[in-house]
Amino acid sequence: MVLQYPQNKILVLSDHPHNFSKTQFLQDLFHCSSTGISIVKDQTWENRYYKVHFDLYIDSCKDIPVWVEEFITPECEPLRNVMAGIILITDIRQTKPQELLHQFMIAAHRNTFVVLVNVNEEVEQDEIDELNEIWSNAFTNVIELVNWKRSKPTVNHNDYGEKLGLDRIQEIIDTHDWLNCEVLPATKIREEIPNEMPLEQIIRNLQSARLKYKSIENSSEADAFANEMADELSRYL
């Protein structure tokens, strides 16, 4: 039996040189000032049609491609499967976005949206539009490159009338299919008591659980252990 957990996590990741940009991005998009916390539980995404609870995962790394290599390992599959979306903040002049996405999409869940947020203000919107057109034909997931400036842009639409920057990211989240989640009418909200565990600890636990599972010779005991670990980790995912 395949367990279907709510896909209600949004990960925001930056490489170290752009941590300051990430701080402002989190405040502007999610109204979140808790940038020192790796997991912010029980956030609410709300628009005129619905409300949904989600957990905000916040992380940084020295090198995004190296981070992706770890994230696409088999041990991290339970974590990938509960991701509604992944937002990567970087300078696309320093990161090769096409190679990065091809590597990333090998393992990403088909319902997970991925947004690359470019913070290099020298990159023209025409270049962004060209890459997005290529990606729209190459991937089935919602994959998008977005230019984002810390100062509010004077133009919020491209030549095709499509939204830009933060407005476009909001639109992607608004139209996302919240798989296995309780989506509430805009007039109704429920309360939950959040559980907390650092993201790094969750990854370590997944790796340890996989090693132990492989060491159990009895298939019934192995299945029982797998179900026990799935239930335990679901409290924090």
Curated annotation (Swiss-Prot):
What GO biological process terms are annotated to this protein in UniProt? vesicle-mediated transport
InterPro entries from the UniProt entry: Irc6
Arranged from A to Z, the UniProt key words for this protein are: Chromosomal rearrangement
GO terms of molecular function: protein-macromolecule adaptor activity
| Gene3D superfamilies in the record | 3.40.50.11960
The domain of life is Eukaryota
The record's family statement is: Belongs to the IRC6 family.
Role, per record: Involved in gross chromosomal rearrangements (GCRs) and telomere healing.
Q: What is this protein called?
A: Increased recombination centers protein 6
